[in-house]
Design a protein with these regions (language model features):
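A structural signal for short, hydrophobic/glycine-enriched beta-strand patches
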Residues: 26-127
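N-terminal type II signal-anchor transmembrane helix
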Residues: 1-37
């Protein structure tokens, strides 16, 4: 096999491996995505952490989750937002960063509850 053929196979394989998870996620979520108007009213919205940047601010994916929770609150779909994330290290605190973000974006402090006992998603759901 020539080096060009090996390179072509590796390139195609890399593209397939890079695109396949996105394709699967899109196919698996088909029909499961709702608008804020379609979501039923519930007492609490639970927002799981998804990472902070080097400054301790929510990463883009987490900001999107928090913005959706804010929209649900503003639309009267939820009364309280519960934020749950990693805070096992002194310099990394997802619940506080998430809480601060929501308060800074218009949700009253009394309506944002932080879960500091996070270990993993399953444990949060069980509690």
């Amino acid at each position: 096999m020539t080096w060009r053929r090996v390179l072509a196979i590796l390139l195609v394989g890399g593209v397939v491996l890079g695109v396949a998870p996105t394709g699967y996620a899109l196919a698996a979520s088909a029909g499961r995505i709702s608008t804020v108007d379609d979501v039923p009213s519930e007492p609490v919205a639970l927002v799981f952490g998804a990472g902070l940047d080097i400054r301790g601010e929510p990463m883009p994916f987490l900001r999107a989750r928090l913005d959706l929770a804010r929209q649900l609150y503003a639309a009267g779909k939820v009364r309280v937002v519960l934020v749950s994330g990693d805070n096992r290290r002194a310099n990394y605190n997802e619940p506080d960063a998430m809480r601060d973000y929501l308060i800074d974006n218009g949700i009253p402090a009394a309506k944002v509850i932080a879960d500091y006992a996070w270990f993993d998603t399953y444990a949060t759901c069980v509690r």
